[in-house]
């Protein structure tokens, strides 16, 4: 800012480099990275697929309960998978996509109405709900908290976020699958094929492996520390501790982590965006923008102001292909 530039001892080149790399020291960025490695653990160990198949087996005899199963699967994986692409697209979808062909239901075809259309719609609903319910359910959530902390100085914990969203989340969990079933009712409402197929797949996978049991233990440990240990240990330290234990206990090989492009791309992108947010604050742009917007919205009722801001946010998304960038 102006005061720094006026200081004779100010070294522009040194401070520019320090500022440019500051994002990589953000605890939020490393929390997201750690959660991505958790997601990799679900994939490598096969635990994510096993959870999905288990719920499909016991809830798949009715199409409606199968819809609930899809949402529950996503919610169970969401606390440790901050990428809805990796979670819904990489873990849940490969299981669910095998179900419509069992009933000769195919995309871009009238047969999609049999069951495929409903299941795919539930995939969209499940990823939207699970991404919102947990801070670590989607990278933009964590990035947004970082911005709130940098700009407004407000700290929101993992547990606070979850408890605030929980009432709405429970209502959506109960209503969304049923309402979708009513508005877009599939032609096939009962079947034994889905549960039978999932049971056969589980038999093929065999019993829980050592890596799966280890990952379950690490998941429970991390969740417990995030919820109850926030006063003792930082959330990021919990995530990095879990990653270290996953490596030490051979749940995820180091070579798989180095090849996990999504995690490294997110690390670099989020760190860069954190730096940009900090720069906008220090340069005074945030104060200027807030003042300008408040001038234009002066005289509006609180409800009208919220509507305008939501519309601006909504239509601005057309300019971005990434939620994190948006």
At which residue positions do the language-model features occur?
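Hydrophobic alpha-helical transmembrane segments of polytopic
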Residues: 66-70, 120-123, 168, 211-222, ...
């Amino acid at each position: 800012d102006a005061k720094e530039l006026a200081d004779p001892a100010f070294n522009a080149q040194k401070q520019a480099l320090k500022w440019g790399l500051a994002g990589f020291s953000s605890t939020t960025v490393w929390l997201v990275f750690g959660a991505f490695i958790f997601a990799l653990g679900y994939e490598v160990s096969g635990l994510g697929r096993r959870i999905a198949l288990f719920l499909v087996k016991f809830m798949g005899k009715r199409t409606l309960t199968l819809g609930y199963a899809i949402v529950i699967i996503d919610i169970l994986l969401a606390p440790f998978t901050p990428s809805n692409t990796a979670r819904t697209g990489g873990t849940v979808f490969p299981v669910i996509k095998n179900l419509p062909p069992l009933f000769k239901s195919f995309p871009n075809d009238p047969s999609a109405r049999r069951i495929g259309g409903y299941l795919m719609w539930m995939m969209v609903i499940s990823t939207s709900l699970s991404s919102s319910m947990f801070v670590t359910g989607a990278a933009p959530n964590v990035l947004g908290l970082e911005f709130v902390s940098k700009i407004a100085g407000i700290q929101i914990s993992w547990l606070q976020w979850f408890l605030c969203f929980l009432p709405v989340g429970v209502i959506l969990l109960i209503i969304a699958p049923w309402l979708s079933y009513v508005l877009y009712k599939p032609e096939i409402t009962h079947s034994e094929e889905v549960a039978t197929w999932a049971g056969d797949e589980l038999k093929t996978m065999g019993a829980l492996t050592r890596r799966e049991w280890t990952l379950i233990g690490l998941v429970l440990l991390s969740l417990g520390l995030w919820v109850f240990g926030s006063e003792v240990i930082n959330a990021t330290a919990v995530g990095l501790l879990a990653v270290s234990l996953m490596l030490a206990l051979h749940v995820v090989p180091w070579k798989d982590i180095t090849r996990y492009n999504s995690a490294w791309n997110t690390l670099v992108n989020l760190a860069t965006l954190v730096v940009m947010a900090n720069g906008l604050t220090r340069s005074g742009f945030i104060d200027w923008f807030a003042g300008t917007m408040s001038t234009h919205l002066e005289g509006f009722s609180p409800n009208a102001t919220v509507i305008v801001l939501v519309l601006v946010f909504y239509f601005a998304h057309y300019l971005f292909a990434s939620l994190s960038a948006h």
